[in-house]
UniProtKB/Swiss-Prot annotation:
GO cellular component: cytoplasm; plasma membrane
Gene of this entry: dnaA
Transmembrane segments: none
PROSITE patterns (UniProt xref): DNAA
Note: Estimated to be present at 2000-3000 molecules per cell.
Protein name stated in the entry: Chromosomal replication initiator protein DnaA
Chain positions covered by the region annotation Domain II: 76-107
SMART domains: AAA, Bac_DnaA_C
Domain notes from UniProt: Domain I is involved in oligomerization and binding regulators, domain II is flexibile and of varying length in different bacteria, domain III forms the AAA+ region, while domain IV binds dsDNA.
Length: 450
């Protein structure tokens, strides 16, 4: 039994417990999570420290229910989210230190290479441009200006350029820095003597290649821009390569002297577009391989992640790290399904998937059963309509995590006991009816990825 199933059964039993007031359930218990430390140790995580105190008297009840569900003796601890996150970060830090030691021993290759960059329609032109210039620095497209929103892979490409040039042109000296780093150095040096300012310029100009990531951080800094302008001209005049990245195209940059904007456009300016779904999916699969996740991840689960995170490569990698952690905590699970994924990422606002609401759930379910949305909300008692209504209620609880009272109101003003009965009935049917389970899985996938 996976953690998602355990949590579902636990919440159903607790809401039916007459000793637990509905307001206590809705305020503190509804949002709890359960995680597995190892085969015999589980941890129940409450949203806040206050919530942890509020459910103190119900801890024995929660422990007993979990043991009943698992049908085995286990150790159960309780904590709250902030504290649990601290514990996770501490564990990750220890694991990272261990990984760093192993990496050094194995002389692990830098991950920011052209070979490790996932190419798709959204970034192909930028990739070709950076790779081409890296193979012939200072010859053409000088400067090379890459622009696009944060998290699209600009930093990866610029670091790949640095690594490639250093590996293939041992006689060339390469300097890589962020725009913020350059600005801080310039501001510091401007407090010093003219001689020291000139020395700083000369030190930067000793390089054969200059790469500045997020050059927009130099905007609205007049004195810094004067230093930058001098350095820029030195590189161009001496056929030394310049690489820049920014969140905007040169024409849209504010806070720069016009002569700098003109020079940004002297070479080649090229955009990295938002990731398309195909590229995001490829990045997820590559990251799963890179993180050596042995548990199989279904295509539906991967599509779910790409729908959430196609706007940011860093978030994609972070989401796969979350999968990796879950996989390590649940070694007995052989497959990561969309049900597990949707539960694992339930803390992420559903707005990231577009308009995900009760209306959408009703529409998808009613379409499947060939009935109207009004029929789901109405009083009709035919078998197909009742089944569709119960499934829609069940999915509303599963996906949106609405309260029983909310769901009752959203489905024709029914009371919360009707919702409990509907949810329990579907839960029981899913355990016995494989075809129904398949249907519900398909509906859930369609709702989440449509």
């Amino acid at each position: 039994m996976n953690l998602n199933d355990i949590l579902k059964e636990l919440k159903l039993s607790l809401i039916a417990n007459k000793n637990i007031d509905e307001s206590v359930y809705n305020d503190y218990i509804k949002t709890i999570n359960i995680y597995k430390k190892d085969l015999s140790n589980y941890v129940v995580v409450v949203k806040s420290q206050f919530g942890l105190l509020a459910i103190k008297q119900f801890r024995p009840t929660i422990e007993n229910e979990i043991k009943k569900i698992l049908k085995q003796p286990v150790n159960i601890s309780f904590t709250y989210e902030q504290e649990y996150q601290k514990q996770l970060e501490k564990t990750e830090s220890i694991n990272k230190d261990h990984s760093d030691i192993i990496s050094k021993k194995n002389k692990k290759v830098n991950e920011n290479t052209f070979e490790n960059f996932v190419i798709g329609s959204s970034n192909e032109q930028a990739f070709i441009a950076v790779q081409t210039v890296s193979k012939n620095p200072g010859i053409s497209y000088n400067p090379l200006f890459i622009y696009g929103e944060s998290g699209m892979g600009k930093t990866h490409l610029l670091k790949a350029a640095k690594n490639y040039i250093e590996s293939n042109f041992s006689d060339l000296k390469v300097s890589y820095m962020s725009g913020d780093e350059f600005a801080r150095k310039a501001v510091d040096i401007l407090q010093k003597t003219h001689k020291e300012i000139e020395q700083f310029k000369n030190e930067v100009c000793q390089n054969d290649v200059l790469i500045i990531d997020d050059v927009q951080f130099l905007s609205y800094k007049e004195k810094t821009n004067e230093i930058f302008f001098t350095i820029f001209n030195n590189f161009i005049e001496n056929d030394k390569q310049l690489f820049f990245s920014s969140d905007k195209s040169p024409e849209l940059l504010n806070g720069f002297d016009n002569r700098l904007i003109t020079r940004f456009n002297m070479g080649l300016s090229i955009a990295i577009q938002k990731l398309d779904n195909k590229t995001a999916t490829a990045i997820i699969k590559k990251e799963i391989k890179n993180q050596n996740i042995k548990t199989e991840v279904t295509n539906e689960a991967i599509n779910f992640i790409s729908n959430y995170y196609s706007d940011d490569v860093r978030k994609i990698k972070g989401s796969v790290s979350r999968l990796n952690f879950w996989s390590q905590q649940n070694p007995e699970e052989k497959v990561i399904t969309i049900e597990i994924i949707s539960d694992l990422f339930r803390d992420i606002p559903t707005s990231k998937l577009g308009i995900l609401n009760v209306k959408k759930i009703k529409e998808v379910v009613s379409e499947k059963y060939g009935i109207s949305v009004n029929a789901i909300d109405g009083k009709a008692r035919s078998k197909s309509i009742v089944t569709a209504r119960h499934i829609a209620m069940y999915l509303t609880k599963e996906i949106l995590n609405h309260t029983l009272a909310q769901i009752g109101e959203e489905f024709g003003g029914r009371d919360h006991t009707t919702v409990i009965n509907a949810e329990r009935k579907i839960e029981m049917m899913l355990k016995k009816d494989k075809q129904l389970k398949k249907t519900v899985d398909i509906l859930k996938n369609k709702i989440l990825t449509k």
